[in-house]
Amino acid sequence: MSERAAFGTSVERLMVNFTNPDPSLGDMRSEYIGGNNNRNAHPYLSDYNVRRALSLAIDRQILVDAGYGKAGKISCNVLPAPAIYASSANDECKTPNVAEANRLLDAAGWKRGSDGIRKKNGVRISILYQTSTNSVRQATQAFIKEMWKQIGVETELRNLSASVFFGGDISSPDTYQKFFTDIEMYTNNFSGTDPQTYMSNWTCKEMAQKRNKWGGNNMPRWCSPAYDALSAKMSISSAMKDRIRLTKEMNDMLMQDYAMIPLIHRGNVSAHSNTLSGVRMNPWDSELWNIADWTRK
C-alpha cells in the first residue's frame, strides 16, 4: 500500500483568550466588555510581548515529527491554502527562538520569581491550557508545556471529552465556545476554495459570548476595527488580485497580533494499492476525483 497526504485548509492552532476567564467574575467571565479589551482584559495575555514570546518558544517541527509525520507540516498562518492566499510574511515561526522570547519578557517587566515563574505587578504567567481528549493532542500539550517552561511560564494541562468540548451545550462551562481557560487548542478549516466567510470569523461581531449564547466564531474575543474594515472591503471586492491582497492582510493582522498561534498544517491522508498509478490526492474534492486517470501497473 502507498500513503499520500493532501493539504487543504486544516490548521491545528492555539486560541488566545483576550478576555479574563477568572471564575470569580461570575457572569462576566471571559466576556468582552467594551473597547478593545480594555475593561475585561486578560491579566497577561493582553500583553503583546507575552503572546509573541509564547509563539517564539514553540518548536513546531518537534510537534510535527512527534504527532503527525507526513500528515502534518509547520504552519505560520491560519490560512495556509489555497496557495494563492498563503502569506510568507510570518515564516519566522518555523524557527523557535527561546532567547528572544526570554528577552521580550525581561524587557516587558515579567521577572522570574523564586519558583522560576514570571510575574509582574503580582500577576503570574500561569496558563490553563485545554483541548479535547486525543493522544496526539495530549502529546502536543506536554511538549508545549516543557517549551514554555524554558521561558518561565507555568502551564496546567486540561483535556475534555470531544463530545463535551465541541458539544455546544450552553449550560456547560467546558465548551470551546465559552473558552473559560487561557489557551485552547483545536483544528478548524473551511470547505471550498474561497476564504471570505472563514476570514470573517474574527470580526468583532463574531465574538462568542453570553449575549449570542456563545454562537459566534471569534473565540479569542479579539476585536480590531481595522480588521473589520478589511473584511467589509473584501465582501464588495470581486477582482481576484484585490481578494488575494485583502486575505493576506487579514491573515497577517491576526498572526502578527498573535490573536491565535498556528501550529500544524494538517493533511488529509489516504492509501491506495501499489498496483495503481495515476492516483493524485486533492484536498478540495473526493479521493476519486481523477479515477478516470487511474491505471493498473
Give the location of each predicted region.
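Short, charged hinge/linker segments at domain and secondary-structure junctions
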Residues: 74-76, 272
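Extracytoplasmic/periplasmic ligand-capture domains
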Residues: 1-69, 73, 83-259, 281, ...
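A glycine-rich phosphate-binding loop feature that marks nucleotide/adenosyl-phosphate handling sites
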Residues: 122-124, 267-271
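Active-site-proximal polar cores
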Residues: 263
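Extracellular/periplasmic juxtamembrane helices and adjacent flexible linkers that interface
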Residues: 84, 266-267
